[in-house]
Amino acid sequence: MGFKMGIVGLPNVGKSTLFNALTRTAAAQAANFPFCTIEPNVGEVAVPDARLFKLADLAKSKQVIPTRMTFVDIAGLVKGASKGEGLGNQFLANIREVDAIAHVLRCFEDGDVTHVEGRVDPVADAETIETELMLADIESIEKRLQNIVRKVRGGDKEAVQQERLMKAALVALEDGQPARVVNVEEEDLKAWKMLQLLTTKPVLYVCNVGEAEAAEGNDHSQEVAVMAAAQGNAHVIISAQIEEEISQLEDDEAAMFLDEMGLAEAGLDRLIQAGYDLLHLETYFTVGPKEARAWTIRQGTTAPKAAGVIHGDFEKGFIRAETIAYSDFVTLGGEQAAKESGKMRAEGKGYVVKDGDVMHFLFNT
């Protein structure tokens, strides 16, 4: 599976410019005007992974199919969004559908680009959106609690669990903390996810800096880094303008441009890696003469579940997984050599897939 990340931010912080660059499309109207993004724009990008191309080269695969990441450019919001101000209602509905939130913060100075609050203060911007999400969660819980309490009185065991979790979330939210700070036990995780609280989603702060500051960041991005560390969230420094420029270049030209800017890799690569880390994701590969393909799974996924990402029948009829570590596959020069060297393992249902595993699944139909 891939994963879906919602790109959010106050108007005119550069989020639509970033989205356009990442998806290599101009679908979003990145104009200097509040609420220019009226409906969510959805775009998929290939996840860059040099390992996949190395495997394809060794296996002489005819086709290379990377795994993909979905970005959703969600309409900008302002203070009062939880009450429907600005484009708040659309924002709140769309953000519930994503796995994580990439919160674009304006960390650049530019007198030609207006700020909805009339100042550049990324920490305050982050607090504005977090507050709106917390207020929306409070309202959602309070509305549902009335019905849950009635079910509890009627002896509904699931309702008892839901009431306990809702009240725990409400305590945190009313204390000014997002619901993600609540310590949830393993047996409560399913019910917790069903609450669909906005502030349970992991957050990645995207510091949008000027071109000259893309390599090292600036004082604004440093403030965000301190805030993110205190919250246990992640952050990444990107120049949306640079990403927009290199999205129009051929790969070799883009590499030269990045080198001139003192950047080791594109912002897209850093953003995706940060997203992977945030959601505890990893990649395994299937490789053969026909195709080399990357698949995304969550860390801790067992072999049958990983097989199910390809097709449900693979999981249902799982027998075993012939597995080669990426390093062994590459070092030894391919599948046959790895097999002859005893590096191909037969893994059963309890095997936890490791990042980079090259796998072939055997299953009953």
Where does each model-flagged region fall?
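Short, glycine/charged-enriched secondary-structure capping and boundary segments
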Residues: 22, 84-87, 116-119, 218-222, ...
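Conserved nucleotide-binding/hydrolysis micro-motifs of P-loop NTPases
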Residues: 25, 51-52, 76-78, 106-112, ...
